[in-house]
């Protein structure tokens, strides 16, 4: 998984910074439970983000996006919100390529957003479940390239490899948040034991990402 992230998404994470679970939805939800802070959701987002936050009694704001920006959150919009926010800690949930809009953030857009997130010490949940599905570019960028220290990356088998029934997801912590590994491990051990063995074998084949498989996916 570490090699896959490095080669295909430009994300440098060691194996001990990566967790595997029964789907990225589960790992996202566990992260929502662990982090205390005010959540920021760009308008036009996956259906489960807000219900997950509500289920823990968390607070959130939905930031407007516009057609002229291809329904993507802009750095100016994020800066304007954070500069007036009364909350001390924030978690931004980004999804690119996006469900439901299909929009994909560019390197330039991510670099601008990263600068704002760094300024305000925002934690980013980067949902990259569709990372290899991009019909416009050779790859979909990751905000972790520009803001590694504050970005937790999520992904999984279901979308990229057309394997919705194979429940396996991953999340990767930056080294700056590696101290949370103990917290995650404790929560994971009390909520799920492991991913089923047959699915793990399928994932091993998928994440080796042969040229034949890459052609099929791309």
Give short role names for the model-derived ranges.
Residues 1-21:
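Conserved N-terminal alpha-helix of the aminotransferase class I/II PLP-enzyme fold
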Residues 14-38, 167-169:
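Conserved beta-loop-alpha segment that forms the PLP phosphate-binding cup at the N-terminus of a helix
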Residues 34-53:
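Conserved PLP-anchoring active-site segment centered on the Schiff-base-forming lysine
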Residues 41, 62, 124-126:
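Hydrophobic residues in well-ordered beta-strands that form the structural core
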Residues 58, 119-122, 149:
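A short helix->loop->beta-strand "cap" motif at the edges of active sites that frequently abuts
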Residues 67-138:
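Active-site phosphate-binding strand-loop segment of PLP-dependent enzymes
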Residues 145, 150-218:
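Conserved core segment of the aminotransferase class I/II
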